[in-house]
Each structure stands twice: as structure tokens, then as C-alpha cells.
Swiss-Prot record:
Places the protein is found: Cytoplasm; Nucleus
Organism, scientific name: Schizosaccharomyces pombe (strain 972 / ATCC 24843)
Gene: mug15
Function (record text): Has a role in meiosis.
Organism classification: Eukaryota, Fungi, Dikarya, Ascomycota, Taphrinomycotina
Protein name: Meiotically up-regulated gene 15 protein
Keyword terms: Cytoplasm, Meiosis, Nucleus
Recorded GO CC terms: cytosol; nucleus
Biological processes annotated in GO: meiotic cell cycle
Amino acid sequence: MNVGDLKSANDLYESVRSIEGVTGVHLFRIRDAGILKSTMIPELDALTTISLDELNKSPTVFTKNLLQGCGGTDLDVPAELKRLVIFVCNILESCNEFTDLGSARLLRLTFDSCQLVIMYDSLFVVAITKDET
């Protein structure tokens, strides 16, 4: 990882923090960048895989509480976030409802009156929680 990557990620972090309605921004460095490559998604058993059915039945699975206290660029990826990233990758495998941001990808998940926005590339995950207005 070079300093430019960290600087651009931090710039992104600072810019989205000031958007109205944003209730949390969480920046994570991915130590195992391979986890974000669809061909390298680890095989998981049913207990650790989060399905769309689960999300529909329990729309609070991915609330900001999942990510609180985990912010920073120097932490290992928490197990819960790994599950979330894998879940996002699984969605991307089954549909094309994401926006191409150059080398990054964007996915929005909406639940209740809140949105969880996941942006990721090979080095970072930025998770943003935003109240819908």
C-alpha cells in the first residue's frame, strides 16, 4: 500500500462525513485484499453466511451498531465486517445493481429508514450509514 492510497481513502472519508443525513462513516483497511475478489470468496457454512432471506426477515442485521467502534485505517477487519463484505460480494455475484467507480465499487442496501452504503476496492472498505429523508 502506498501513501497515496491512504491519502485518497482519508479524503473520501472526510468528504462523506460532512454530507447531510450521514450518521456514520467507517473506513477499514483490508489486510487480506483477496477477500474482495469474487473468485476468492471463502466458502462458508450456513451459520456464517448471511442470505437475502435473512436480511428481509431481519432488516436490522446490518445496522450502524455492527460497525460502531471499529473505525480507523489500522485495524484488522472485524469478523462481522468480513461477513458483511462477503455478503456484498455474494450480491454482486448474483446481480449487477452496483455503480462502477473506476477501480472501486458501490452498493446501497436500504432497510427501514436508513441506508447502508458500501464502497470498496482492493484495499479499503468504506461503510456509510445514512438516514433517508
